[in-house]
């Protein structure tokens, strides 16, 4: 089977310089969702027709299995499909999809192609309470499809029809090419309509068959920011419903955003206003507090992620406590039972089993062993303005508050760093390190006072 995805439109109502099909839904371009669905049908040829913003669209979705055809002038859907014909297998049927209709399910498309068979013409239709704006399916006295009439060309009687054309069709490729070549643009829009090929198919003796999706939202398209927002909420509701069915506890399904894939184990609980991006895995008994952002991360069993924690590109072990207001940046690896508390940032660093950094700390480019205590206000000074250096802290080290570790530096097993110390040389095992400081007290000191005006 061939699949053609039309993605050449300008999207004027979006009021944006970004091509319409590249506007994000759940964090990915609209067109990417359509391509993903198309791939599940295993087409032999997958062609995207591009036009407005062609190079940006090509760059955004380029892949070895995707071919591109260019529609230099946007002269209608029939003209767009014509541009793809040279790239198709003429002996296989062609399914036509739209780059701005992202929520159609693969099962719906499979049902349409199965109904049409190898040589039939199939149209996906929907019956709407309010069909305004859509082309109507006109049937004959026997209930068979006779033609499709666009809204602007319809008579008052035809406008009363509730069954509408979604634009998604499947047809025999070789014959479709002949029909498209015979299209005329004598209509209100002055365009070559793909829908006009229906009458030609009927005249050629083909019965045009139809199927309908299980849900109206499967065929909703995006022509404005309002419609984009509506589809975003529909998609997120569907994701939330699937998580609930799988046993995940959601404090409020309407306040969850998944912009990628979220895999959850048993007894996972997610509070409100959480965002998951990329590929995220939450193992059994993970609890995520409110207002967290987790991107491309794996969170181990029993871990608690408290409010306002941001995690990106991190590996988190089991029974870890994170936050509130913690930040894990790419390359962070937290072993089991470690703690990263409020206003602690970890980047490209390992925190060993049972180690704790509970307050106001920056840990960057560091390898920290097991059972290490990192006091409040500790900074690993990893950057000299040109190069990054690593800090190594071995097992059972105690680092006091307000410590600066100037990398490259190693603190060996069991050492103690006194509060307020700057460490710029390696520390031996079990040693106490402190910077000698003299404390001076003055009796009778009087604070300066402001002059009264």
Swiss-Prot record:
It is found in: Cytoplasm. It catalyses: alpha-D-glucosamine 1-phosphate + acetyl-CoA = N-acetyl-alpha-D-glucosamine 1-phosphate + CoA + H(+); N-acetyl-alpha-D-glucosamine 1-phosphate + UTP + H(+) = UDP-N-acetyl-alpha-D-glucosamine + diphosphate. GO terms for biological process: cell morphogenesis; cell wall organization; lipid A biosynthetic process; peptidoglycan biosynthetic process; regulation of cell shape; UDP-N-acetylglucosamine biosynthetic process. Residues 1-225 are annotated as: Pyrophosphorylase. Its cofactor is Mg(2+). UDP-N-acetyl-alpha-D-glucosamine binds at residues 6-9, 20, 71, 76-77, 98-100, 135, 150, 165, 223, 329, 347, 362, 373. Residues 226-246 are annotated as: Linker. GO terms for molecular function: glucosamine-1-phosphate N-acetyltransferase activity; magnesium ion binding; UDP-N-acetylglucosamine diphosphorylase activity. Mg(2+) binds at residues 100, 223. Binds 1 Mg(2+) ion per subunit. InterPro entries: Bifunctional_GlmU, GlmU-like, GlmU_C_LbH, Hexapep, MobA-like_NTP_Trfase, Nucleotide-diphossugar_trans, Trimer_LpxA-like_sf. CDD domains: GT2_GlmU_N_bac, LbH_GlmU_C. Keywords: Acyltransferase, Cell shape, Cell wall biogenesis/degradation, Cytoplasm, Magnesium, Metal-binding, Multifunctional enzyme, Nucleotidyltransferase, Peptidoglycan synthesis, Repeat, Transferase. Acetyl-CoA binds at residues 376, 382-383, 401, 419. GO terms for cellular component: cytoplasm; membrane. Its EC number is 2.7.7.23, 2.3.1.157. Catalyzes the last two sequential reactions in the de novo biosynthetic pathway for UDP-N-acetylglucosamine (UDP-GlcNAc). The C-terminal domain catalyzes the transfer of acetyl group from acetyl coenzyme A to glucosamine-1-phosphate (GlcN-1-P) to produce N-acetylglucosamine-1-phosphate (GlcNAc-1-P), which is converted into UDP-GlcNAc by the transfer of uridine 5-monophosphate (from uridine 5-triphosphate), a reaction catalyzed by the N-terminal domain. In the N-terminal section; belongs to the N-acetylglucosamine-1-phosphate uridyltransferase family. This is Bifunctional protein GlmU.
């Amino acid at each position: 089977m061939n699949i053609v995805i039309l993605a050449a439109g300008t999207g004027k109502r979006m009021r944006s310089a970004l091509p319409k099909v590249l506007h994000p839904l759940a964090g990915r371009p609209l067109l990417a969702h359509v391509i993903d669905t198309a791939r599940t049908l295993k087409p032999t040829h997958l062609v995207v027709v591009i036009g407005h913003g062609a190079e940006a669209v090509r760059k955004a979705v380029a892949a070895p299995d995707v071919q591109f055809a260019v529609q230099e002038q946007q002269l209608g859907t029939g003209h767009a499909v014509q541009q793809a014909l040279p790239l198709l297998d003429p002996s296989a049927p062609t399914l036509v999809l739209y780059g701005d209709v992202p929520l159609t399910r693969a099962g719906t498309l499979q049902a349409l192609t199965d109904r049409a068979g190898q040589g039939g013409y199939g149209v996906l239709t929907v019956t709407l309470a309010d069909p305004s704006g859509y082309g109507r399916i006109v049937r004959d006295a026997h209930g068979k499809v006779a033609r499709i009439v666009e809204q602007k060309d319809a008579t008052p009687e035809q406008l009363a029809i509730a069954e509408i054309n979604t634009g998604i069709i499947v047809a025999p490729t070789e014959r479709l090419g002949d029909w498209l070549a015979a299209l005329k643009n004598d209509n209100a829009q002055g365009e070559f309509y793909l829908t006009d090929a229906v009458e030609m198919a009927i005249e050629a003796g083909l019965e045009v068959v139809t199927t309908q999706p299980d849900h109206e939202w499967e065929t909703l398209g995006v022509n404005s920011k309002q419609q984009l927002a509506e589809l975003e909420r529909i998609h997120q509701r569907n994701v939330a419903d699937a998580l609930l069915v799988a046993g995940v506890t959601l404090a409020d399904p309407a306040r969850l955003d998944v912009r990628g894939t979220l895999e959850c184990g048993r007894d996972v609980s997610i509070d409100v206003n959480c965002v998951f991006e990329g590929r995220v895995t939450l193992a059994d008994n993970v609890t995520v507090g409110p207002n967290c952002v987790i991107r491309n991360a794996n969170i181990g069993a029993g871990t608690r992620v408290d409010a306002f924690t941001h995690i990106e590109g991190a590996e988190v072990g089991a029974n870890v406590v994170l936050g509130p207001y913690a930040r894990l940046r790419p390359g962070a690896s937290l072993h089991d039972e470690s703690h990263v508390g409020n206003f602690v940032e970890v980047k490209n660093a390992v925190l060993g089993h049972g180690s704790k950094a509970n307050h106001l700390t920056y840990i960057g480019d560091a390898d920290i062993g097991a059972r290490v205590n990192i006091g409040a206000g500790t900074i690993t000074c990893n950057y000299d303005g040109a190069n990054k250096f690593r800090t190594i802290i071995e097992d059972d080290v105690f680092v006091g508050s307000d410590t600066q570790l100037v990398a490259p530096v190693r603190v060996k097993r069991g050492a103690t760093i006194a509060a307020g110390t700057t460490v710029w040389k390696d520390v031996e095992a079990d040693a106490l390190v402190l910077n000698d400081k003299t404390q001076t007290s003055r009796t009778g000191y009087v604070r300066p006072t402001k002059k009264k005006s």
